[in-house]
Each structure stands twice: as C-alpha cells, then as structure tokens.
C-alpha cells in the first residue's frame, strides 16, 4: 500500500507495523451513534465503558479516512501542507493505538483524557492547512485544475471534514464528561444541550455577525424572529436536543453572508431603511427548520451549487500570515462546512434564491433524537474507485453553454 509522504522517526519495521494496523482497522466500518445514544450514555456516564468504546472506535474512524488521504492525486498529496496534515493523522493514530490493550486503570483513564486533548488540539488547524494545500497545488499547476482532480478533491474534503467533525464529537463528549472541568450542575450532557433554545442560538449568532458587519460597513440589518409548531400544545420557544456550537457555526456563517448581501445590495443605507433579516423557526413531526430570509439581491441559479464547492471562492485568497488571525477568510469554506455540520446528524442546508430580490437559507434538523444519526464516511471499494474515476461525459444537452458556443440554431437555419 502507499503510505503518506511523511517522515517517520521510527524504524522501517515500525512503518510496516503501522501499515498493518491501518489495514486492520480500515477493514471495519465506523459505528454511527444517534443524538439519543449520546444523551443516554451521557446521563449514565461510565468512564470505563467510554474508554473501551473509544479505544476501538477512534482507530477505526482515523484509519478509514487515512486510507482515503493516501488516494489523493499526487500533485495534492505531496504538497507541504497536506504532508503536514497526514503526519498529524499518523501521530494521532499511533497515540490511540497505545491503549489498544491497556486496562482501564485509574492512571490509564487519566492519561487517555490528556491524550485526547492533545489529539484534538493537534487537529485544530486541519481545515486551514488542507485549504492551504489546495492553494499550493493550484499554484504548482499554474492555477489550472482538471475536472477529475477537482471532483476528487470535493469528494475527499467533504469526507475528511465530516470525519473530523465526528472524531471531535467523540473526543469532546469524553473529555467534557470525564475531564477536569465537567459542566457541574449545568444541564449540558457533554457538548449536547437537552433543551437547546433555538431562538437563543439564533440571537447569539446574529449579534456576533452583526458586530462584524457594523465594524466593516458601519451599519447592519435588523433581526425578526417568528416561531411555529405543528403541534398546538407545544410551548414556545422551540427547544430540541442538539449541539449548540454546531448550530451556532451554521447560523453565524449564514448571517454573515446575508448581512453582507443586504448592505451591499442596498448601498450602505442606514439601519432604518435596510430590510431586516427574517428568521422562521418551525417544528414539525419529522423536521425542525430554521429559515433565514434576506433581501440581498439573490444569487443566479447557475452559481448556487458553486457556493458549496471548496475550489470556488469569490473572495481573495488569504496570505499565509493571515492563516491564524482570520480563520477561513478567503477560502470560501464556510458554507460547505456548515452544510456538513447540518448533515452530520442527518439534517441539511438548502439555499433557495430569487435573483434580483433575495435568498432563503434553510437549516434542516431532525426533530427526533433517535433519528439524528451520525453520517460517517466509510472506506471501501466504492469510495476508493471514486478517486480513480474520470468525470463522465454528459449525455444531456446543455442549452446555456451550447448557445454561447454556437449562436446558429436549427430554428435560425
């Protein structure tokens, strides 16, 4: 097999052993958990049970995505930044394997929590560093990336970042429940809020996005919130079991986009004349929807899908010196990663836009916690084939592009 382009400090026998363990653990599928399972375990938390589960599950999730890293196109895999990310995954995989057969003694349990903290911190900059790797690849290729390579990168980054979200979820739950600073007396179960007030998270995300908007544009649109429930007896505000930080990330990104669109579309008018952002929080039997509606001029339908692509950004690329001061600035990763957060527990983000008027962004969440299961990437023959596949030739006419290339039509003839 092809190992990552990283330098191992251990001998070649250790490299062979690592490859063997990668093959072993990547042969298992990850075990997705539901929000209900996270809650049930957290309410009756047993550190030894969590330790025994994680010492097997974390290597499986790491190995599955590490196998896919090795399948990346060579011109991306061998960039400095991607090599660095690869080395982080190798080190974390080795760190977790230390506990493969270690008994859950008090000392081992304490050391396990400390090592999980180190692993989480080690991977803090995965998103930014991978983005820098893509930039390096594009620069090395003269700014041109062929369609098959772009398709492979889009496919891989969705899976890498979803895997990262899931691994951080497992680590955060364990360290919050059994670390040195648990939420003593709070209602949170690890990073889950069993009664998450959606309108509170909406207001929090709005206020922080508004602060940035006011700083840059000296004005910002107001906020209006409405709440609706399909059950007449439901109390308002609408609450659900969720990870508030995940929802906040999605809302903050969407609010930033909407505020910028509104202010720029309406010519930096005063707050009183800017149309407000309207948020509708709706609870049904199957879905909970949070809809943000703006009057920011909308997006052409041809560009909507592009907004979720990692290789597409309308903003200038950041310099390396800005990498840590302005997280994700210029990479255009906010929307695609927001959608991954929504999809992680089988929700989604959908954009509906009317060009010339405005855009509706809808966050879908599962209303029932036992249906909110993790969506996890699995390494298998299907996924490995994707990296070697070419983009299929279109078998439908594309009238828009066709008209641009060939003005004379059968009708005109």
UniProtKB/Swiss-Prot annotation:
UniProt keyword ATP-binding present: yes
Residue ranges annotated for the Histidine kinase domain, each copy included: 137-369
UniProt keyword terms in alphabetical order: ATP-binding, Kinase, Mitochondrion, Nucleotide-binding, Transferase, Transit peptide
SMART domains associated with the record: HATPase_c
Annotated GO MF terms: ATP binding; protein kinase activity; pyruvate dehydrogenase (acetyl-transferring) kinase activity
UniProt-annotated location(s): Mitochondrion matrix
Catalytic activity entry: L-seryl-[pyruvate dehydrogenase E1 alpha subunit] + ATP = O-phospho-L-seryl-[pyruvate dehydrogenase E1 alpha subunit] + ADP + H(+)
Residues the record lists as binding ATP: 253-260, 294, 313-314, 330-335
Main location: mitochondrion
Alphabetical list of InterPro entries matching this protein: AK/P_DHK_N_sf (IPR036784), BCDHK/PDK_N (IPR018955), BCKD/PDK (IPR039028), HATPase_C_sf (IPR036890), His_kinase_dom (IPR005467)
GO cellular component terms listed in the entry, alphabetical order: mitochondrial matrix; mitochondrion; pyruvate dehydrogenase complex
Enzyme class name: transferase
GO biological process: regulation of acetyl-CoA biosynthetic process from pyruvate; regulation of glucose metabolic process
Pfam family, one: HATPase_c
EC number: 2.7.11.2
Domain of life: Eukaryota
Gene3D superfamilies listed in its UniProt record: Alpha-ketoacid/pyruvate dehydrogenase kinase, N-terminal domain, Histidine kinase-like ATPase, C-terminal domain
Role: Inhibits the mitochondrial pyruvate dehydrogenase complex by phosphorylation of the E1 alpha subunit, thus contributing to the regulation of glucose metabolism.
PANTHER family for this protein: [PYRUVATE DEHYDROGENASE (ACETYL-TRANSFERRING)] KINASE, MITOCHONDRIAL, PYRUVATE DEHYDROGENASE KINASE
Family stated for the protein in its record: Belongs to the PDK/BCKDK protein kinase family.
Protein's name according to its UniProt entry: [Pyruvate dehydrogenase (acetyl-transferring)] kinase, mitochondrial
Organism in which the protein naturally occurs: Drosophila melanogaster (Fruit fly)
Gene label: Pdk
